[in-house]
């Protein structure tokens, strides 16, 4: 029946799938895809990865999904200001290679600078000494030949996303018992119960994204369940990154004054430290928050979270609006984070490298598995259980 619906009546996810089908139809010689995984569910992304990795013609794709790029790409085109460079290999190979090259150049420059300083000190010290004139002349020639390569400025800047818990968690983190929620007549989840243990980093999944957002709102204390209870441990200090942050920016405060609302220390010097880590430097901190881009707002929200020194993070789709460098920095820190994390994401790599436990919400119950994301999506027993829970009549 969906095949005969008007495009205008379709939701965003359905429209994306129609446009994707239109692009793929006829197997064109050159396929240009701009963020093709946006608004696609996990199963569709996996299908697209498989389809494109076996595609016989040319594919040019822009994406922030690192796993997707690794799965389909044979070459990476790196555009950095006016420089365009072509690399053989997938995204991970390019990332590791570029990081290694940057470190090697920095080390070479450091050694060259040290040698330059040593030669200049010798020349200054013995320039008036006739007995050392030969050695001085020799070192002058060495100094002229010494090449300290100028490191070109890069548009790639990695924010300092560092969450540091003020205190270690106790043994009791979070207990959720019998939570149910129906919105506008649609049951999002029913009698959901789970206990978060010390060290758990839990990725929440659902075919209905509103279910996860609603659950997080309830856990964070911003919404009420139809039934059930949420109980936090006494040692837990949580920080919440909501999916929709628009209400935080409905004002004309400057970035620094906006952040001051959430800080005990409101001095500009202190706040600059946090904003600098989030790549807001100089006079940028006086920019009005109501004109910020989606990525800038997200960096403000992350700075706000860092101020809390929380030992439990609740993150609803945290990579939204972030560039690749910010996603990588976020990902790297969460892997090292010593507290607990409850999060949702559409980023395969992000989930697989952070989560050690998966909880999937369905209208007819939940699935709770202590395993990685890769293991979860390929587990036959999980697939059977998902089919049963999603297809059970209410």
Predicted regions and their residues:
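Short, surface-exposed loop/turn segments at secondary-structure junctions
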Residues: 4-7, 129-133
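Proline-centered turn/helix-capping motifs that create local helix->coil transitions or kinks
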Residues: 131-135, 145-155, 231
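Regular, well-ordered alpha-helical segments
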Residues: 96, 103, 121, 125-128, ...
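ABC ATPase nucleotide-binding domains
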Residues: 105-125, 132-141, 157, 379-394
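ABC-family P-loop ATPase nucleotide-binding domain
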Residues: 151-175
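ABC ATP-binding cassette signature C-motif
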Residues: 1-109, 166-394
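Generic structural signal for well-ordered, non-transmembrane alpha-helical segments
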Residues: 141-144, 174
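Short hinge/gating elements
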Residues: 124-126, 159-163, 257-259
């Amino acid at each position: 029946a969906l095949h005969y619906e008007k495009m205008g009546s379709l939701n965003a996810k359905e429209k994306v799938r129609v446009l994707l089908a239109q692009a793929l139809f006829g197997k064109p010689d050159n396929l240009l895809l701009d963020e093709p995984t946006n608004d696609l569910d996990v199963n569709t992304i996996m299908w697209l990865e498989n389809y494109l990795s076996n595609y016989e013609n040319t594919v040019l794709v822009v994406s922030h999904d690192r796993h997707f790029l690794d799965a389909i790409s044979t070459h990476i085109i790196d555009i950095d200001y006016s420089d365009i460079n072509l690399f053989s290999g997938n995204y991970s190979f390019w990332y590791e290679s570029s990081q290694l090259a940057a470190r090697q150049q920095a080390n070479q420059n450091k050694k060259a600078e040290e040698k330059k300083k040593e030669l200049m000190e010798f020349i200054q010290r013995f320039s008036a000494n006739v007995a050392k004139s030969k050695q001085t002349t020799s070192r002058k020639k060495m100094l002229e030949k010494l090449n300290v390569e100028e490191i070109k400025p890069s548009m790639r800047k990695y924010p300092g996303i560092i969450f540091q818990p003020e205190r270690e968690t106790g043994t009791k983190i979070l207990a959720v018992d019998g939570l149910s929620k129906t919105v506008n007549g649609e049951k999002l989840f029913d009698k959901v119960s789970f206990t978060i243990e010390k060290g758990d980093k839990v990725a929440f999944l659902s075919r209905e994204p509103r279910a996860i957002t609603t659950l997080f709102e309830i856990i964070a204390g911003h919404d009420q369940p139809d039934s059930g209870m949420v109980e936090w441990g006494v040692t837990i200090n949580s920080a919440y990154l909501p999916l929709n942050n628009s209400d935080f920016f409905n004002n004309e405060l400057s970035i620094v004054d906006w952040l001051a609302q959430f800080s005990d220390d409101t001095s500009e010097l202190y706040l600059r430290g946090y904003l600098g880590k989030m790549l807001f430097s100089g006079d940028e901190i006086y920019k009005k928050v109501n004109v910020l881009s989606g990525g800038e707002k997200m960096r403000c929200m992350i700075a706000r979270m860092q101020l809390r020194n929380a030992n439990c993070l609740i993150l609803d789709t945290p990579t939204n609006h972030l560039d690749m460098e910010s996603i990588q920095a976020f990902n790297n820190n969460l892997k090292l984070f010593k507290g607990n994390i409850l999060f949702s994401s559409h980023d395969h790599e992000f989930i697989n490298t952070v989560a050690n436990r998966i909880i999937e919400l369905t209208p007819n119950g939940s699935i709770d598995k202590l395993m990685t994301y890769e293991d979860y999506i390929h587990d036959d027993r999980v697939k059977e259980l998902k089919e049963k829970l999603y297809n059970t009549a209410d």
